[in-house]
From Swiss-Prot:
The gene is D2. The lineage of its organism: Eukaryota, Amoebozoa, Evosea, Eumycetozoa, Dictyostelia. One of its GO terms (cellular component) is esterosome membrane. It comes from Dictyostelium discoideum (Social amoeba). This is cAMP-regulated D2 protein. GO terms for molecular function: carboxylic ester hydrolase activity. Residues 1-20 form the signal peptide.
Length: 535
């Protein structure tokens, strides 16, 4: 009996030691484990922050789920490792190192990355930024070095970078398909963040959506959609090509028919379409061409969300005009030479005076004679691409941004802030035409403070500018006022019905009235931006 008692006591002791070790292990790694509504995940705890790479937010949209709305995940039992980034969504990425994913490309791509402060707990209530990457709705990924959000996490903000289906897989609209699968992916990611970010230490009542380029265009669409509104309460739109407009059903259907012909399927035969490989899909997508005429600007985004009257009820710029956008604090901005990369990619040879005038007449069939004196062609024998770039920058980005900002100030109660980024980085650019220019996307490595990961060597003034930009964004995400919280060099005044103020982002930051007495934007306003804001 004594021997049996001793044995039992020893056994209990061993069990207790084992259990204690297990509890100790859980305690020591607790910061790396977060329990979501679908199961536990394990991330990485760095010295200054935590990061969870490749967190799934929907079932993989493959096989029978290709061209279907995103579907909720199935729960899992064991702790799922989220230690490495996942593939970018199906695409032929041409954005260069640090912007194209080194992991590869896959249709199984509905994942997101979460960056949090190191000390975040479920009680922290840190503000949240959800970042929607750009890339003309055809390329791009949130899981790349450019969007590394370490600096934001170190500044007490949680950042979630998302992926969504691109190109024809995300935005093919037909009589049977609404064409907003990639947009619904974004909404599914926002829903996931809203439902789960509290477990990471975030405040679901303080979620800011932010996007650049097509990501900013997406932000504008979310501001019109009743499907999105409950999942965020502030917005940042960086370099949105609002004038291009989202696709109407007719244009979307035409692009879909050309794609189906290229891939060898009837547009209504989903079995055939789903039977094609990813590479076959991408090859056929690449061959989809556009006719010129008044649709020339659609070349900027061959594939995009579709105005279906339900998920997206109207063009974002029309919603702005009618005061039908979500009334939330908003930052709107752009860079100085947005259109140069597009113009010099589309027109690789010099554009002469006659060709330039034809292009202006195509884009502005009713207003060309009013536009040409403001944007005169270069003398005969010289290249008119520089002035064409200025015109398209103003028409697609700068002037509709002005319209958006001023109209918000008149129609909405929430504050709107405007910025214009003009700093020429000391590091080079991959496109020769962008040397000594501020091209589309060039600001992002400063906005994210990811310049070292991008191999850029900035001088001290530029590093200080990056910190100042970080502080403005952190303050806005935290308080909805970019001036309250972390130190900023200049008070960024909101635009009101009586005050036009733009924050000029240069190594010496200042504010200016860039809206009043602008004859170019005044003239472009009268084109009604492709009839999106006609009186």
């Amino acid at each position: 009996m004594n021997k049996l008692l001793v044995f039992i006591l020893l056994l209990l002791l061993l069990i207790n030691i084992s259990f204690a070790r297990k509890r100790s292990y859980i305690k020591n790694t607790d910061a790396s484990i977060v329990v979501t509504q679908f199961g536990a995940i394990k991330g990485i705890v760095e010295d200054t922050h935590r990061v969870f790479y490749g967190v799934p937010f929907a079932q993989p949209p493959v096989n029978q789920l290709r061209w279907e709305n995103p579907i909720d995940l199935k729960p899992w039992e064991n702790v799922r490792e989220t230690l490495t980034q996942k593939s970018q969504c199906a695409q032929k990425c041409n954005l260069g190192p640090g912007v194209c994913s080194p992991i590869g490309t896959s249709e199984d791509c509905l994942y997101l990355d979460v960056f949090t402060p190191k000390d975040a707990t479920p009680n922290s209530k840190y503000p949240v930024i959800v970042y929607i990457p750009g890339g003309a709705f055809s390329v791009g990924s949130g899981s790349v070095p450019l969007y590394d959000a370490t600096k934001f996490a170190q500044s007490s903000v949680i950042v979630v970078n998302i992926n969504y289906r691109l190109g024809v897989l995300g935005f093919m609209g037909t009589d049977l398909m609404h064409g907003n699968y990639g947009f619904l992916d974004q909404i599914k990611a926002l829903e996931w963040v809203y439902n789960n970010i509290g477990s990471f230490g975030g405040n679901k009542e303080m979620i800011t959506i932010w996007g650049e380029s097509a990501g900013a265009f997406s932000v504008s669409a979310h501001l019109t959609s009743t499907y999105s509104r409950q999942y965020f309460n502030a917005a940042i739109s960086s370099s949105s090509p609002l004038t291009v407009g989202l696709k109407d059903k007719t244009t979307a259907r035409g692009n879909a028919n050309r794609f189906a012909t290229n891939v060898g399927c009837n547009i209504e035969d989903l079995t055939c379409l789903r039977g094609k490989s990813m590479d076959e899909i991408l090859d056929a997508q690449e061959k989809v061409g556009l006719t010129f005429g008044d649709k020339i600007l659609d070349a900027f985004t061959i594939w995009s969300p579709v105005i279906d009257g339900d998920i997206i009820p109207m063009q974002p710029l029309t919603a702005v005009k009618e005061g039908k956008t979500y009334d939330v604090p908003t930052i709107i901005g752009n860079v100085k030479h947005e259109a140069i990369p597009f113009i010099y990619s589309f027109f690789q040879d010099s554009v002469g005076i006659d060709y330039y005038r034809v292009l202006v007449a195509i884009v502005f069939p009713l207003n060309a004679m009013k536009i040409l004196p403001l944007y005169p062609a270069a003398p005969r024998g010289q290249d008119s691409r520089p002035i064409l770039s200025e015109l398209i920058t103003d028409y697609l980005f700068r002037c509709p941004d002005r319209y958006h900002t001023v109209t918000n100030a008149k129609k909405l109660s929430s504050p709107t802030y405007h910025y214009h980024y003009v700093h020429v980085k000391s590091t080079g650019h991959s496109l020769d035409a962008c040397d000594d220019k501020v091209c589309h996307g060039t600001e992002l490595s400063l906005f994210f403070n990811s310049y070292e990961l991008m191999g850029e060597r900035l001088d001290n003034d530029e590093k200080e500018l990056a910190i100042d930009i970080n502080n403005y964004i952190v303050n806005f995400a935290t308080t909805h006022n970019p001036n309250t919280g972390l130190d900023v060099p200049v008070q960024w005044r909101q635009v009101t019905s009586t005050q036009n103020s733009t924050l000029i982002l240069e190594t010496t930051i200042e504010t200016k009235d860039t809206f009043t007495n602008d004859p170019k934007c005044n003239a472009l306003d009268l084109t009604y931006y492709r009839n999106q804001v006609r009186p």
